[in-house]
């Protein structure tokens, strides 16, 4: 599972201008435990006590994202325990009355089209689930209201606002160990606005946005070997991807931390582990 992130990724999320319905992360936002049944959480996971006392359980950057984007729902993993919380955004941040994971507020409505307010009551409903093994509480069904147009096909679509953020921050991507300084705020240039607007006109379907192409292709040989010590004697090579090539070309961007597919296999980047 990928759960490490850079300041740039957090900056990009904080720069997203529209409402978000659902966030899915590995880590919990920090201090989210204060807005659920903390006593029950510590009863199940007593080794969390020191981190709770020090107010360092969870990710501070993700709490910034939670406060900024205010999604209707936030789902996390990582801590291998089922836990629910209701986080208020527009009133006192005092921990709410503990809610169980099974408790649903009345008249709950969530949306997934057109970026209306994330939740009518100005809260985020947080849910983490237990480890996916027998006898653990690892599943819960959550129903969301969606626009009927979202159900007409099984395709995924690019989000125009996110494309603008990606295009405007590409110059901040670097392979150097020292990251480039980030601006205080992200301003979307007129050029980027025009590029994305043209993409929506030329490639969009007029309703849901720009369809993500189904252009998967095999870019590396299949692996059939096995090594008990985790090393098969080969050297891993950096490989490009046709989907990355197409994505960058669509936005008029160059490779900065990736390589084109046609250059795959030319640069050694370490050993291959299995």
Task: Give the positions of each predicted feature.
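Extended recognition/assembly regions associated with phosphoester-bond processing machinery
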Residues: 1-271
């Amino acid at each position: 599972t990928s759960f490490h992130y850079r300041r740039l990724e957090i900056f990009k999320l904080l720069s997203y201008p529209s409402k978000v319905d659902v966030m899915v992360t590995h880590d919990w936002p920090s201090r989210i435990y204060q807005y659920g049944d903390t006593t029950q959480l510590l009863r199940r996971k007593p080794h969390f006590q020191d981190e709770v006392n020090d107010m360092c359980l969870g990710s501070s950057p993700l709490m910034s994202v939670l406060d900024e984007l205010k999604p209707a729902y936030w789902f996390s993993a990582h801590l291998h325990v089922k836990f629910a919380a209701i986080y208020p955004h527009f009133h006192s941040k005092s921990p709410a009355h503990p809610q169980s994971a099974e408790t649903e507020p009345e008249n709950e409505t969530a949306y997934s089209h057109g970026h209306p307010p994330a939740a009518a009551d100005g809260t985020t409903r947080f849910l983490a689930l237990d480890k996916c093994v027998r006898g653990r509480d690892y599943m819960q069904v959550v129903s969301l209201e969606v626009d009927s147009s979202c159900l007409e096909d099984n395709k995924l679509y690019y989000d125009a606002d996110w494309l603008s953020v990606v295009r405007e921050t590409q110059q901040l991507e670097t392979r150097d160990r020292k990251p480039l300084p980030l601006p205080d705020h992200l301003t979307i240039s007129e050029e980027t606005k025009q590029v994305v607007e043209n993409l929506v006109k030329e490639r969009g379907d007029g309703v849901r946005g720009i369809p993500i192409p189904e252009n998967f292709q095999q870019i590396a040989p299949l692996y059939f070997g096995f090594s008990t010590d985790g090393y098969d004697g080969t050297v891993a090579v950096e490989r490009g991807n046709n989907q990355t090539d197409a994505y960058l070309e669509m936005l008029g961007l160059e490779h900065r931390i990736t390589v084109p597919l046609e250059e795959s296999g030319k640069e050694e980047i370490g050993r291959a582990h299995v």
